[in-house]
Every structure is written in C-alpha cells, then in structure tokens.
C-alpha cells in the first residue's frame, strides 16, 4: 500500500474551514468539493494514458489521452457522494459506480448493503471516495470487493485519515503495490467511539444534515 498526504497551503486552508464546527452544510459541501478536486489532481498522477495524434493550428504533433477501459469512480454511500462532483470534474469521461456500506457503531465493522458496479472490473483503474478513513474497516471491505472483481489498481481519496485506520489498510494490503490512499491529513488518533480526533465530525451529517 502507498500513502500520499497532500502538503499544500490551499489543501490545509480548506481543511481547516471544514474542521470548524461553525461551518454550515452548504459551505461544508462547497469546501469538500473544492478540496476533493485538489486531492484528485494528485490521485490521478498515474492515470493510464496512451499516445494520441493531434493537429494544432500550427502543425501535427503527438499528445496523450486516457486509455480504455475508462477509469471508474466509486463513492461509498452516503458521505462519498459529497466527493463525487469534485472528482469527475477532473475525470469527466470516467464511469461512476456506487457502493453502499454502513459501519456498525457497536462492532465498528462494515457491511455492504448495495452496489451498482460492473461484475468484471478487469484492467480498470478505480478511484474510491470515502471522506473519513477512521477504523479502516469500510475501506478495506470496499477495496477487497473491487480487487476480487479484477480491478487493476485502487486509489482511495479521503479527506482525513487516522493512524489506526491506515495501519488496518496497510496490514490488509501490505503486499499489494497497486493500492494507494490519498488524503489531506493524517490526524492524531481515534476516540473510544471510533471517531477521528481532532477530525471534523461526521462527514455525512455535516454534508447533508443529520438523518
């Protein structure tokens, strides 16, 4: 597993505003969208491309274009939906699938309750959107699900990560070089309820209101 923590003043600035308990849902959604676009720039650094001829107003030359099959973006419901627009802004031709996963607040284990994905992901680059990498259970379950269906490599974009969750993911995919986590920050720890400290609260609730 590879870890990329984005060190950039704009990332830090937007993350600080997201952490602020006074930030309302509309502002939180906008900031999350902007932050994801910044993370996506780094997350797609190794996206697969191929040479492509192009004629400019001056002469013919060769550039690149995304290869087939197209990348697939997979937000984990529901909080991952708040990251989708920021991701597809940079990858507008990507396909979008969905994974519905929920964490049991007693056991902290993740279970899948819905999926809208191709059965065969052979050769696909997959970008998973999950704002909070806390215990790591949800992300491990999601990545395992995707790799079992043939995904070539999986990159997870997270607004925040906890050391405990990163260790769980690292242990699960220690020998899998094609699993990458891209995050804006690694926070101090998890509390007794499995929440990231200092964190930013429950990302889903702050994006959409408590439901």
UniProtKB/Swiss-Prot annotation:
It catalyses: UMP + diphosphate = 5-phospho-alpha-D-ribose 1-diphosphate + uracil. Uracil binds at residues 196, 201-203. Keywords: Allosteric enzyme, Glycosyltransferase, GTP-binding, Magnesium, Nucleotide-binding, Transferase. Its cofactor is Mg(2+). 5-phospho-alpha-D-ribose 1-diphosphate binds at residues 78, 103, 130-138, 202. SUPFAM superfamilies: PRTase-like (SSF53271). InterPro entries: PRibTrfase_dom (IPR000836), PRTase-like (IPR029057), Upp_B (IPR034332), UPRTase/APRTase (IPR050054), Ura_phspho_trans (IPR005765). The keyword GTP-binding applies. One of its GO terms (biological process) is UMP salvage. Its EC number is 2.4.2.9. Pathway: Pyrimidine metabolism; UMP biosynthesis via salvage pathway; UMP from uracil: step 1/1. Allosterically activated by GTP. Binds 1 Mg(2+) ion per subunit. The magnesium is bound as Mg-PRPP. GO terms for molecular function: GTP binding; magnesium ion binding; uracil phosphoribosyltransferase activity. Belongs to the UPRTase family. Catalyzes the conversion of uracil and 5-phospho-alpha-D-ribose 1-diphosphate (PRPP) to UMP and diphosphate. PANTHER family: ADENINE PHOSPHORIBOSYLTRANSFERASE, URACIL PHOSPHORIBOSYLTRANSFERASE, CHLOROPLASTIC. This is Uracil phosphoribosyltransferase. It comes from Kineococcus radiotolerans (strain ATCC BAA-149 / DSM 14245 / SRS30216). The gene is upp.
């Amino acid at each position: 597993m590879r870890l990329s923590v984005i060190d950039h003043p704009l990332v830090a600035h937007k993350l600080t505003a997201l952490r602020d308990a006074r930030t309302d849902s509309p502002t939180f959604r906008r900031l999350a969208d902007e932050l994801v676009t910044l993370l996506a720039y780094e997350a797609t650094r190794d996206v697969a491309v191929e040479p492509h001829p192009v004629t400019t107003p001056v002469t013919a030359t060769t550039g690149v274009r995304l290869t087939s099959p197209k990348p697939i973006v997979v937000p984990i419901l529901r909080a991952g939906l708040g990251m989708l627009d920021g991701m597809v802004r940079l990858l507008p031709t990507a396909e979008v699938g969905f994974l519905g996963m929920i964490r049991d607040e007693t056991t902290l284990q993740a279970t899948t309750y819905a999926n809208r994905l191709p059965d065969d992901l052979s050769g696909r680059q997959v970008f998973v959107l999950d704002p909070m990498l806390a215990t790591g259970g949800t992300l491990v379950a999601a990545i395992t699900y995707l790799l079992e269906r043939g995904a070539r490599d999986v990159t997870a974009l997270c607004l925040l990560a906890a050391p405990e969750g990163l260790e769980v993911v690292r242990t699960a995919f220690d020998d899998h070089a094609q699993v990458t986590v891209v995050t804006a920050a690694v926070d101090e720890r998890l509390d007794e309820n499995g929440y990231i400290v200092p964190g930013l609260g429950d990302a889903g609730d702050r994006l959409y209101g408590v439901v």
